[in-house]
Amino acid sequence: MAQFDLVHINCQYLDRHLTFPLLEFLCGKEIYNQQELLEYILETVKKTNMIDYTMDTRKRLNLSQEMPEELVQQKADVLATLKQLQNEVAPIMKATDILKDGETMKDSKTFVSALQRDYNFKMEHLYSAYKLAKYLYECGNYQESTSYLYFCLIVMAPSDKNYLDVLWGKLAAEILTLNWNTALEDLTRLRDYIDNASFSTLQALQQRTWLIHWSVLVFFNHPKGRDLIIEMFLYKPLYLNAIQTMCPHIMRYLATAVVINRTRRNALKDLIKVIQQESYTYRDPITEFLECLYVNFDFEGARLKLHECQTVILNDFFIVSCLNEFVEDARLMIFETFCRIHQCITISMLADKLNMKPNEAECWIVNLIRNARLNAKIDSKLGHVVMGTQPLSPYQQLVEKIDSLSMRSEHLADLIERKSKQKNQESIDSWKYY
Protein backbone atom coordinates (compact mmCIF):
# COMPACT_ATOMS: atom_id res chain seq x y z
CA MET A 1 0.00 0.00 0.00
CA ALA A 2 2.50 2.59 -1.26
CA GLN A 3 -0.08 5.39 -1.19
CA PHE A 4 -0.03 5.38 2.63
CA ASP A 5 3.71 4.80 3.06
CA LEU A 6 5.36 7.65 5.00
CA VAL A 7 9.02 6.61 4.77
CA HIS A 8 9.81 9.11 2.00
CA ILE A 9 8.36 11.91 4.17
CA ASN A 10 9.76 10.76 7.52
CA CYS A 11 13.28 10.35 6.12
CA GLN A 12 13.35 14.08 5.29
CA TYR A 13 13.33 14.82 9.03
CA LEU A 14 15.74 12.11 10.18
CA ASP A 15 19.51 11.93 10.31
CA ARG A 16 20.97 9.88 7.45
CA HIS A 17 21.94 7.04 9.81
CA LEU A 18 18.44 6.90 11.29
CA THR A 19 16.98 6.31 7.83
CA PHE A 20 18.85 3.03 7.31
CA PRO A 21 16.62 0.93 9.63
CA LEU A 22 13.54 2.30 7.83
CA LEU A 23 14.96 1.57 4.38
CA GLU A 24 16.10 -1.93 5.37
CA PHE A 25 12.63 -2.57 6.77
CA LEU A 26 11.13 -1.66 3.38
CA CYS A 27 13.48 -4.11 1.66
CA GLY A 28 11.51 -6.91 3.30
CA LYS A 29 8.23 -5.57 1.92
CA GLU A 30 6.79 -5.60 -1.58
CA ILE A 31 5.94 -1.91 -1.68
CA TYR A 32 8.76 -0.61 -3.88
CA ASN A 33 11.07 -2.03 -6.53
CA GLN A 34 13.85 -3.80 -4.60
CA GLN A 35 16.56 -2.89 -7.09
CA GLU A 36 15.73 0.83 -6.91
CA LEU A 37 15.52 0.70 -3.13
CA LEU A 38 18.94 -0.92 -2.79
CA GLU A 39 20.43 1.60 -5.22
CA TYR A 40 19.05 4.40 -3.06
CA ILE A 41 20.53 2.79 0.08
CA LEU A 42 23.90 2.51 -1.69
CA GLU A 43 23.85 6.18 -2.72
CA THR A 44 22.97 7.17 0.85
CA VAL A 45 25.54 4.98 2.59
CA LYS A 46 28.27 6.29 0.26
CA LYS A 47 27.89 9.66 2.01
CA THR A 48 29.04 8.06 5.29
CA ASN A 49 32.25 6.29 6.32
CA MET A 50 30.53 2.91 6.68
CA ILE A 51 32.73 0.96 4.26
CA ASP A 52 31.53 -2.53 5.27
CA TYR A 53 27.87 -1.53 4.86
CA THR A 54 28.70 -0.07 1.44
CA MET A 55 30.33 -3.34 0.34
CA ASP A 56 27.43 -5.40 1.70
CA THR A 57 24.94 -3.28 -0.27
CA ARG A 58 27.04 -3.65 -3.43
CA LYS A 59 26.92 -7.45 -3.03
CA ARG A 60 23.15 -7.35 -2.66
CA LEU A 61 23.05 -5.43 -5.95
CA ASN A 62 25.23 -8.15 -7.55
CA LEU A 63 27.98 -5.66 -8.25
CA SER A 64 31.67 -6.59 -8.29
CA GLN A 65 32.73 -8.66 -5.26
CA GLU A 66 36.08 -6.88 -5.15
CA MET A 67 36.37 -3.60 -3.28
CA PRO A 68 36.65 -0.68 -5.75
CA GLU A 69 39.82 1.39 -5.63
CA GLU A 70 38.01 4.45 -4.27
CA LEU A 71 36.63 2.39 -1.35
CA VAL A 72 40.08 0.95 -0.63
CA GLN A 73 41.45 4.49 -0.47
CA GLN A 74 38.50 5.72 1.61
CA LYS A 75 38.99 2.89 4.12
CA ALA A 76 42.68 3.77 4.46
CA ASP A 77 41.81 7.45 4.95
CA VAL A 78 39.16 6.61 7.56
CA LEU A 79 41.57 4.46 9.59
CA ALA A 80 44.28 7.14 9.41
CA THR A 81 41.88 9.88 10.52
CA LEU A 82 40.58 7.74 13.38
CA LYS A 83 44.10 7.09 14.61
CA GLN A 84 44.94 10.79 14.47
CA LEU A 85 41.79 11.79 16.39
CA GLN A 86 42.33 9.07 19.00
CA ASN A 87 45.86 10.37 19.59
CA GLU A 88 44.46 13.87 20.10
CA VAL A 89 42.08 12.70 22.84
CA ALA A 90 44.64 10.42 24.52
CA PRO A 91 45.06 12.81 27.51
CA ILE A 92 41.34 12.50 28.24
CA MET A 93 41.47 8.70 28.21
CA LYS A 94 44.11 8.79 30.96
CA ALA A 95 41.50 10.30 33.26
CA THR A 96 39.66 6.99 33.71
CA ASP A 97 39.49 7.32 37.51
CA ILE A 98 37.67 10.65 37.28
CA LEU A 99 35.38 9.37 34.53
CA LYS A 100 34.30 6.53 36.84
CA ASP A 101 33.67 8.86 39.79
CA GLY A 102 29.92 9.47 39.73
CA GLU A 103 30.01 12.31 42.27
CA THR A 104 32.64 14.26 40.33
CA MET A 105 30.81 13.70 37.03
CA LYS A 106 27.60 15.22 38.41
CA ASP A 107 29.11 18.70 38.70
CA SER A 108 30.53 20.07 35.44
CA LYS A 109 32.79 22.68 37.08
CA THR A 110 34.25 20.19 39.58
CA PHE A 111 34.83 17.71 36.79
CA VAL A 112 36.64 20.22 34.54
CA SER A 113 38.71 21.52 37.47
CA ALA A 114 39.82 17.98 38.31
CA LEU A 115 40.77 17.35 34.69
CA GLN A 116 42.75 20.58 34.47
CA ARG A 117 44.49 20.01 37.80
CA ASP A 118 45.41 16.36 37.43
CA TYR A 119 45.64 15.82 33.67
CA ASN A 120 46.54 19.20 32.18
CA PHE A 121 43.19 19.28 30.36
CA LYS A 122 42.74 22.03 27.75
CA MET A 123 39.68 23.09 25.76
CA GLU A 124 41.40 21.82 22.60
CA HIS A 125 40.95 18.32 24.02
CA LEU A 126 37.20 18.92 24.25
CA TYR A 127 36.90 19.80 20.57
CA SER A 128 39.07 16.80 19.69
CA ALA A 129 36.60 14.60 21.62
CA TYR A 130 33.73 16.25 19.74
CA LYS A 131 35.40 15.59 16.36
CA LEU A 132 36.18 11.99 17.29
CA ALA A 133 32.61 11.36 18.47
CA LYS A 134 31.25 12.72 15.21
CA TYR A 135 33.71 10.68 13.16
CA LEU A 136 32.96 7.46 15.04
CA TYR A 137 29.27 8.10 14.44
CA GLU A 138 29.88 8.52 10.69
CA CYS A 139 31.73 5.19 10.74
CA GLY A 140 28.72 3.49 12.34
CA ASN A 141 30.48 2.95 15.68
CA TYR A 142 27.56 4.40 17.64
CA GLN A 143 28.31 2.77 21.00
CA GLU A 144 31.82 4.23 21.26
CA SER A 145 30.55 7.55 19.95
CA THR A 146 28.10 7.87 22.87
CA SER A 147 30.98 7.79 25.39
CA TYR A 148 32.68 10.81 23.84
CA LEU A 149 29.37 12.62 23.33
CA TYR A 150 28.55 12.11 27.02
CA PHE A 151 31.94 13.56 27.94
CA CYS A 152 31.22 16.58 25.71
CA LEU A 153 27.83 17.16 27.35
CA ILE A 154 29.42 17.26 30.81
CA VAL A 155 32.29 19.57 29.91
CA MET A 156 30.75 21.73 27.20
CA ALA A 157 28.83 24.88 28.14
CA PRO A 158 25.25 25.12 26.79
CA SER A 159 26.30 28.34 25.06
CA ASP A 160 28.97 26.49 23.05
CA LYS A 161 28.34 26.54 19.28
CA ASN A 162 28.57 22.72 19.15
CA TYR A 163 26.34 21.99 22.16
CA LEU A 164 23.13 21.56 20.16
CA ASP A 165 24.88 19.25 17.68
CA VAL A 166 26.11 17.13 20.59
CA LEU A 167 22.56 16.84 21.95
CA TRP A 168 21.24 15.68 18.57
CA GLY A 169 24.18 13.31 18.06
CA LYS A 170 23.80 11.74 21.50
CA LEU A 171 20.09 11.13 20.93
CA ALA A 172 20.71 9.57 17.49
CA ALA A 173 23.48 7.31 18.79
CA GLU A 174 21.35 6.08 21.72
CA ILE A 175 18.46 5.33 19.35
CA LEU A 176 20.72 3.37 17.00
CA THR A 177 22.14 1.34 19.91
CA LEU A 178 18.59 0.69 21.18
CA ASN A 179 19.29 2.23 24.60
CA TRP A 180 15.73 3.45 25.05
CA ASN A 181 15.99 4.64 28.68
CA THR A 182 19.00 6.82 27.92
CA ALA A 183 17.43 7.92 24.63
CA LEU A 184 14.38 9.16 26.53
CA GLU A 185 16.61 11.14 28.91
CA ASP A 186 18.43 12.68 25.93
CA LEU A 187 15.13 13.43 24.22
CA THR A 188 13.89 15.29 27.31
CA ARG A 189 17.18 17.19 27.61
CA LEU A 190 17.07 18.21 23.95
CA ARG A 191 13.42 19.26 24.14
CA ASP A 192 14.13 21.46 27.18
CA TYR A 193 17.05 23.06 25.36
CA ILE A 194 14.96 23.80 22.25
CA ASP A 195 12.05 25.17 24.29
CA ASN A 196 14.32 27.55 26.24
CA ALA A 197 16.78 28.58 23.52
CA SER A 198 16.60 31.98 21.84
CA PHE A 199 15.72 30.65 18.39
CA SER A 200 13.72 32.64 15.88
CA THR A 201 10.12 31.44 15.44
CA LEU A 202 11.04 29.63 12.21
CA GLN A 203 14.15 28.00 13.70
CA ALA A 204 12.21 26.80 16.75
CA LEU A 205 9.51 25.36 14.48
CA GLN A 206 12.12 23.50 12.41
CA GLN A 207 13.87 22.14 15.51
CA ARG A 208 10.58 20.92 16.99
CA THR A 209 9.56 19.30 13.71
CA TRP A 210 12.79 17.28 13.64
CA LEU A 211 12.44 16.39 17.31
CA ILE A 212 8.87 15.18 16.77
CA HIS A 213 10.02 12.69 14.14
CA TRP A 214 12.98 11.44 16.17
CA SER A 215 10.85 11.10 19.28
CA VAL A 216 8.43 8.70 17.55
CA LEU A 217 11.29 6.18 17.37
CA VAL A 218 11.79 6.49 21.13
CA PHE A 219 8.15 6.60 22.22
CA PHE A 220 7.09 3.38 20.46
CA ASN A 221 10.03 1.49 21.99
CA HIS A 222 9.97 2.79 25.57
CA PRO A 223 7.53 1.39 28.19
CA LYS A 224 6.37 4.91 29.12
CA GLY A 225 6.29 6.11 25.53
CA ARG A 226 2.58 5.62 24.96
CA ASP A 227 1.73 8.14 27.64
CA LEU A 228 4.56 10.51 26.78
CA ILE A 229 3.71 10.75 23.08
CA ILE A 230 0.16 11.80 23.97
CA GLU A 231 1.42 14.37 26.47
CA MET A 232 3.92 15.86 24.03
CA PHE A 233 2.01 15.74 20.74
CA LEU A 234 -1.52 16.43 21.96
CA TYR A 235 -1.18 18.45 25.16
CA LYS A 236 1.89 20.62 24.50
CA PRO A 237 0.59 23.46 22.28
CA LEU A 238 4.00 24.25 20.77
CA TYR A 239 4.39 20.68 19.50
CA LEU A 240 0.77 20.29 18.46
CA ASN A 241 1.15 23.52 16.49
CA ALA A 242 4.32 22.15 14.84
CA ILE A 243 2.44 18.99 13.83
CA GLN A 244 -0.47 20.95 12.41
CA THR A 245 1.82 23.38 10.58
CA MET A 246 4.69 21.22 9.35
CA CYS A 247 3.90 17.51 9.64
CA PRO A 248 0.21 16.56 9.91
CA HIS A 249 1.17 12.99 8.89
CA ILE A 250 2.38 12.54 12.49
CA MET A 251 -1.32 12.29 13.36
CA ARG A 252 -1.01 8.61 12.38
CA TYR A 253 1.35 7.92 15.27
CA LEU A 254 -0.57 10.01 17.78
CA ALA A 255 -3.80 8.25 16.81
CA THR A 256 -2.13 4.84 17.11
CA ALA A 257 -0.81 5.70 20.58
CA VAL A 258 -4.28 6.73 21.77
CA VAL A 259 -5.91 3.58 20.38
CA ILE A 260 -3.44 1.20 22.08
CA ASN A 261 -3.42 3.13 25.37
CA ARG A 262 -6.52 2.01 27.26
CA THR A 263 -5.70 4.17 30.27
CA ARG A 264 -5.88 7.35 28.16
CA ARG A 265 -9.31 6.99 26.58
CA ASN A 266 -10.02 10.49 27.88
CA ALA A 267 -7.64 11.79 25.19
CA LEU A 268 -9.94 10.51 22.43
CA LYS A 269 -12.20 13.56 22.52
CA ASP A 270 -9.27 15.96 22.07
CA LEU A 271 -7.69 13.75 19.41
CA ILE A 272 -10.89 13.60 17.37
CA LYS A 273 -11.09 17.41 17.36
CA VAL A 274 -7.55 17.65 15.97
CA ILE A 275 -8.21 14.91 13.38
CA GLN A 276 -11.27 16.80 12.16
CA GLN A 277 -9.34 20.08 12.01
CA GLU A 278 -6.55 18.48 9.97
CA SER A 279 -8.68 16.18 7.81
CA TYR A 280 -8.26 18.50 4.81
CA THR A 281 -4.44 18.21 4.97
CA TYR A 282 -3.95 14.61 6.07
CA ARG A 283 -6.02 11.43 6.12
CA ASP A 284 -5.15 7.76 6.31
CA PRO A 285 -7.03 4.58 7.34
CA ILE A 286 -6.08 5.05 11.01
CA THR A 287 -7.45 8.60 11.31
CA GLU A 288 -10.43 7.66 9.12
CA PHE A 289 -11.17 4.67 11.37
CA LEU A 290 -11.56 7.02 14.34
CA GLU A 291 -13.68 9.44 12.31
CA CYS A 292 -15.99 6.65 11.17
CA LEU A 293 -16.38 5.40 14.71
CA TYR A 294 -16.61 8.57 16.80
CA VAL A 295 -17.83 11.25 14.38
CA ASN A 296 -20.08 9.44 11.92
CA PHE A 297 -20.91 6.35 14.03
CA ASP A 298 -20.44 4.40 10.81
CA PHE A 299 -19.71 0.91 12.10
CA GLU A 300 -19.53 -0.66 8.65
CA GLY A 301 -17.06 2.03 7.57
CA ALA A 302 -15.04 1.49 10.76
CA ARG A 303 -14.93 -2.26 10.10
CA LEU A 304 -13.59 -1.72 6.57
CA LYS A 305 -11.09 0.90 7.74
CA LEU A 306 -9.80 -1.43 10.46
CA HIS A 307 -8.94 -3.94 7.75
CA GLU A 308 -6.99 -1.21 5.89
CA CYS A 309 -5.32 -0.16 9.16
CA GLN A 310 -3.75 -3.59 9.48
CA THR A 311 -2.06 -3.23 6.08
CA VAL A 312 -0.86 0.30 6.90
CA ILE A 313 0.61 -0.71 10.28
CA LEU A 314 2.20 -3.85 8.86
CA ASN A 315 4.18 -1.66 6.44
CA ASP A 316 5.10 1.15 8.85
CA PHE A 317 8.44 0.71 10.62
CA PHE A 318 7.48 2.98 13.53
CA ILE A 319 4.35 1.08 14.59
CA VAL A 320 4.59 -2.42 13.10
CA SER A 321 5.24 -3.88 16.58
CA CYS A 322 1.83 -2.55 17.71
CA LEU A 323 -0.19 -4.41 15.06
CA ASN A 324 -1.84 -7.10 17.21
CA GLU A 325 -2.45 -4.69 20.06
CA PHE A 326 -3.97 -2.11 17.73
CA VAL A 327 -6.39 -4.61 16.19
CA GLU A 328 -7.45 -5.89 19.63
CA ASP A 329 -7.99 -2.41 21.06
CA ALA A 330 -9.69 -1.12 17.91
CA ARG A 331 -12.17 -4.00 18.10
CA LEU A 332 -12.79 -3.13 21.73
CA MET A 333 -13.45 0.50 20.76
CA ILE A 334 -15.96 -0.59 18.10
CA PHE A 335 -17.60 -2.86 20.63
CA GLU A 336 -17.79 -0.20 23.37
CA THR A 337 -19.19 2.43 21.00
CA PHE A 338 -21.72 -0.01 19.58
CA CYS A 339 -22.78 -0.94 23.10
CA ARG A 340 -23.49 2.68 24.03
CA ILE A 341 -26.18 2.67 21.36
CA HIS A 342 -27.52 -0.87 21.83
CA GLN A 343 -28.11 -2.39 25.26
CA CYS A 344 -28.77 -5.85 23.82
CA ILE A 345 -26.70 -7.18 20.90
CA THR A 346 -26.74 -10.45 19.00
CA ILE A 347 -23.40 -12.22 18.82
CA SER A 348 -23.78 -12.68 15.05
CA MET A 349 -24.28 -8.92 14.59
CA LEU A 350 -21.26 -8.21 16.78
CA ALA A 351 -19.11 -10.73 14.88
CA ASP A 352 -19.96 -8.95 11.64
CA LYS A 353 -18.95 -5.55 13.05
CA LEU A 354 -15.65 -6.93 14.39
CA ASN A 355 -14.63 -8.93 11.31
CA MET A 356 -14.78 -12.15 13.33
CA LYS A 357 -16.57 -15.49 13.19
CA PRO A 358 -19.50 -15.84 15.67
CA ASN A 359 -17.68 -18.42 17.85
CA GLU A 360 -14.54 -16.23 17.88
CA ALA A 361 -16.61 -13.19 18.83
CA GLU A 362 -18.27 -15.09 21.69
CA CYS A 363 -14.89 -16.26 23.05
CA TRP A 364 -13.54 -12.73 22.71
CA ILE A 365 -16.45 -11.29 24.77
CA VAL A 366 -16.12 -14.06 27.38
CA ASN A 367 -12.45 -13.13 27.84
CA LEU A 368 -13.36 -9.46 28.22
CA ILE A 369 -15.88 -10.28 30.95
CA ARG A 370 -13.47 -12.72 32.64
CA ASN A 371 -10.71 -10.09 32.75
CA ALA A 372 -13.10 -7.56 34.35
CA ARG A 373 -12.83 -5.23 31.37
CA LEU A 374 -16.50 -5.47 30.42
CA ASN A 375 -19.71 -5.21 32.42
CA ALA A 376 -21.96 -7.58 30.45
CA LYS A 377 -23.69 -10.95 30.44
CA ILE A 378 -24.02 -13.53 27.65
CA ASP A 379 -27.29 -15.34 26.96
CA SER A 380 -25.97 -18.39 25.12
CA LYS A 381 -29.44 -19.76 24.31
CA LEU A 382 -30.56 -16.61 22.51
CA GLY A 383 -27.07 -15.66 21.35
CA HIS A 384 -27.34 -12.22 22.96
CA VAL A 385 -24.96 -9.97 24.85
CA VAL A 386 -26.73 -7.85 27.49
CA MET A 387 -24.80 -4.77 28.58
CA GLY A 388 -24.57 -3.35 32.09
CA THR A 389 -23.95 0.32 32.88
CA GLN A 390 -20.34 1.50 32.64
CA PRO A 391 -19.95 4.86 34.38
CA LEU A 392 -16.68 6.76 34.06
CA SER A 393 -14.54 6.10 37.13
CA PRO A 394 -13.62 9.05 39.42
CA TYR A 395 -9.97 8.49 38.51
CA GLN A 396 -10.70 8.78 34.78
CA GLN A 397 -12.78 11.91 35.38
CA LEU A 398 -9.92 13.46 37.37
CA VAL A 399 -7.33 12.62 34.68
CA GLU A 400 -9.58 14.14 32.02
CA LYS A 401 -9.95 17.37 34.01
CA ILE A 402 -6.20 17.58 34.69
CA ASP A 403 -5.34 17.08 31.01
CA SER A 404 -7.81 19.76 29.97
CA LEU A 405 -6.49 22.26 32.54
CA SER A 406 -2.88 21.45 31.65
CA MET A 407 -3.50 22.11 27.98
CA ARG A 408 -5.25 25.41 28.70
CA SER A 409 -2.47 26.49 31.10
CA GLU A 410 0.27 25.78 28.56
CA HIS A 411 -1.67 27.61 25.87
CA LEU A 412 -2.06 30.67 28.12
CA ALA A 413 1.61 30.57 29.12
CA ASP A 414 2.62 30.45 25.46
CA LEU A 415 0.31 33.37 24.66
CA ILE A 416 1.73 35.47 27.53
CA GLU A 417 5.30 34.68 26.46
CA ARG A 418 4.64 35.72 22.87
CA LYS A 419 2.98 38.97 23.96
CA SER A 420 5.89 39.69 26.29
CA LYS A 421 8.42 39.15 23.49
CA GLN A 422 6.38 41.37 21.17
CA LYS A 423 6.22 44.11 23.81
CA ASN A 424 9.98 43.92 24.44
CA GLN A 425 10.66 44.08 20.71
CA GLU A 426 8.46 47.16 20.37
CA SER A 427 10.36 48.74 23.26
CA ILE A 428 13.69 48.01 21.54
CA ASP A 429 12.43 49.32 18.21
CA SER A 430 11.35 52.59 19.83
CA TRP A 431 15.00 53.29 20.79
CA LYS A 432 16.24 52.98 17.23
CA TYR A 433 15.47 56.63 16.56
CA TYR A 434 17.57 57.99 19.47
Swiss-Prot record:
Domain PCI: 219-392
Keyword Cell cycle belongs to the record: no
GO MF terms, alphabetically ordered: translation initiation factor activity
Location(s) in or outside the cell: Cytoplasm
UniProt cross-references to PROSITE patterns, sorted A to Z: PCI
GO cellular component: eukaryotic 43S preinitiation complex; eukaryotic 48S preinitiation complex; eukaryotic translation initiation factor 3 complex, eIF3e
Assembly and interaction partners: Component of the eukaryotic translation initiation factor 3 (eIF-3) complex. The eIF-3 complex interacts with pix. Interacts with mxt.
Name by which UniProt lists this protein: Eukaryotic translation initiation factor 3 subunit E-1
Lineage: Eukaryota, Metazoa, Ecdysozoa, Arthropoda, Hexapoda
